[in-house]
Curated annotation (Swiss-Prot):
Gene3D superfamilies linked to this entry: Isopropylmalate Dehydrogenase (3.40.718.10)
Main subcellular location: cytoplasm
Subunit comment: Homodimer. Probably interacts with PlsY.
Protein name in UniProt: Phosphate acyltransferase
One GO BP: phospholipid biosynthetic process
HAMAP family linked: PlsX
Subcellular location: Cytoplasm
Pfam families: FA_synthesis
Amino acid sequence: MTKAPVTPERDIAASGPYALAVDAMGGDRAPDIVLAGLDLAADRHPKARILLIGDEALLRPALAKYPKAARLCDIRHAAASISMDMKPTAALRVRGSSMRMAMEAVAAGEACGVVSAGNSGAMLALAKIIVKALPGISRPAMIAVEPSARGDIVMLDLGANIACDARNLVEFAIMGEAFAQAALGLPSPTIGLLNVGSEELKGDDRLRQASERLRASPLAPQFHGFVEGHDITAGTTDVVVTDGFTGNVALKTGEGALKLAFSLLKRVFQTNLLTRLGYLLVKPGLERMREWIDPRRYNGALFVGLNGIVVKSHGGADGESFAAAVDVAMDAVTHHLNDKIRARLEQLGMGAPEPVAPAAAKAAPEPVS
């Protein structure tokens, strides 16, 4: 491992683990966007220590262009990387990849968390095998902050688990509560289970069982009950819990709806001279709205429930987006997210997962991205 130049602003020999291990080779435009993101993140986390893992021959000259990032980073050479289209089973066989080495750094206690813009399926597979799940968590989930009319909310699962049972949904509620406390600063976030209706009789057995368990748990005062799709954007609850299939569809439907809305607005304002003049009047407000819901601000989905912080950046992220993913990871590390989850699991008597029936013990479907 080689070290970036020592400056008065950073002590390379600082005790304790690195804050983050960063996969420098993951993503469509790595390593440039990774380094650009770290350069931006350096202003917000000037004392963070980063273990940058990737091809040293590429990273050393590239890092020289980003002096703020260089002050935070030590470089560790990785001879291989995982492509965006590689299947998880194949990725597991690639020894010495930058993503795998980042996971190994967390498992060994060298770093508190991982950030990568690489292959989602490979990332989850490696995280499960190397970082491993927290005791009491049967399935890690993907969680992220999303905008709503009432302010930011958190939602999970966004694609890590296609099918879930009642216990999984209760675990997601526990992890969602802890993440909302860490990311949004909410002492007692409200929780909703996504369903086809808000009435107690709606939905399937697993949803009703999960609802009953939550109402009988210490989370009961925060449990709102069932919420519907429109409640996500309305911000009815601070945490929205669902299975990975439904969550991923809801997320991407919302993203598509926003693109459609802006496309229609643009078309309307280009209709004639009068509408063009009207656009000039409302342009400042539209720009503020676009900035508020800018997907780059919300980049960074956390694989929550692992024995370490693992954050997935969008593969097509730019520097600003990647910096947002670093922010998510740093928030989780500095607010001791996993300690909050462990404490709540212990309070609920869920220190170990329920036994899995042989038929259910088969490998879960690959996550959707």
